[in-house]
């Protein structure tokens, strides 16, 4: 059965580094071996901000204040489901890092991020985050291979 999955993704930034999660602890993880930001699936009734705060707390032990929404990602039929992902960054947080149940947490220098084993789409949308451009993008994969993508940069002024 094909489902629509809502999720969040957050890149926590501090002193020229980004907190990344090396997904190595769960053998059946669709992201096993990849480096990702933090985040995960919505629970019933959550807003994107509530979801990203809960997921970051669960995965890292950090409590976010004022996460900033940067864009929306859509991955149609990715591993059998349609994924809609709200992408955030955060620079304001408290707490101490825990031993994550999802993988190994590490602060990575921003200039070294693209050298990590990332999903191909991450290489494309990282610059949009750094440029501060709000984006809405669709990335289509066949297996683990990115086949096509499209992006819009909607005007976000009110």
Provide a role label for each language-model segment:
Residues 1-20, 41:
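Conserved N-terminal beta-strand and adjoining loop/helix that marks the start
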Residues 3, 17-19, 28, 54-58, ...:
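Recognition helices and adjacent regulatory flanks at domain boundaries
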Residues 5, 13, 29-30, 80, ...:
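A generic fold-level signal
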Residues 13-17, 26, 91-96, 132:
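Short, charged/polar surface micro-motifs in flexible loops or helix N-caps
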Residues 18-30, 34-44:
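N-terminal first-folded block
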Residues 42-65, 75-128, 149-158:
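Unchanged
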Residues 71:
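Catalytic phosphate/metal-binding cores of nucleic-acid and nucleotide-processing enzymes, i.e., regions
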Residues 129-148:
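Short, active-site-adjacent segments that bind or coordinate small-molecule cofactors and metal centers
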């Amino acid at each position: 059965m094909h489902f629509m999955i809502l999720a969040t993704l957050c890149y926590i930034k501090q002193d020229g580094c980004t907190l990344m999660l090396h997904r190595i602890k769960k053998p059946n993880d669709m992201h096993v071996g990849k480096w990702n930001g933090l985040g995960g699936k919505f629970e019933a009734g959550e807003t994107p901000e509530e979801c990203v705060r809960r997921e970051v707390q669960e995965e890292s032990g950090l409590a976010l204040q004022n996460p900033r929404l940067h864009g929306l990602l859509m991955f149609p039929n990715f591993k059998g489901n349609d994924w809609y992902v709200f992408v955030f960054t955060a620079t304001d947080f408290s707490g101490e890092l825990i031993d994550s149940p999802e993988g190994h947490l590490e602060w990575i220098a921003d200039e070294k991020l693209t050298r990590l084993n990332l999903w191909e789409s991450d290489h494309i949308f990282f610059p949009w985050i750094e440029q501060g451009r709000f984006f809405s993008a669709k990335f289509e994969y066949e297996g683990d291979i990115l086949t096509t993508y499209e992006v819009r940069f909607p005007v976000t002024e009110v």
